[in-house]
Amino acid sequence: TLAYCAERNGEYDIYTIPAEGGVETRLTDAPGLNDGSEYDSVGEYIWFNSVRSGLMQAWRMKADGSEQTQMTFDENWNTWFPHISPDRKKVTMVCYKKGDVQPGEHVPHKFVELRMMNADGSNVQTLVKLFGGQGTINVNSWSPDSKKFAFVTYKIRGIGIPEEE
């Protein structure tokens, strides 16, 4: 079964559809953007981000759409693209400072933080502050052994680095 974000009647929600085709099933119905759906390695949960609480935050739900649970609660950051590790113990995410973007925006060319937390939402830590944003960790890039993950950062002259470099 595939999970994806789709726009229907001006609302963005998470849907699933059988891989062989068929009828799609709407899993979320909260107002605003629900995006970034990703199954955990055993297909029990779908991780996603949602603006339903006022800021973009990480959420988790059962694969059938039940038990939708907010996993991050940061009042100063918009949290995007939660990626669960293959061993289902850790989650990485990219965070935009409140005020740098609107809650539903995930734009490039911003200073962001990459964070990691335990899969139960505890022990949130900033791993690195970098210049990036859209494209930094849009897809799950954990190593199969759950010990490393890849991300993208870049520099633009005049933004984040001096013009003369």
Where are these regions (language model features)?
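Sequence signature of WD/YWTD-type beta-propeller architectures
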Residues: 1-165
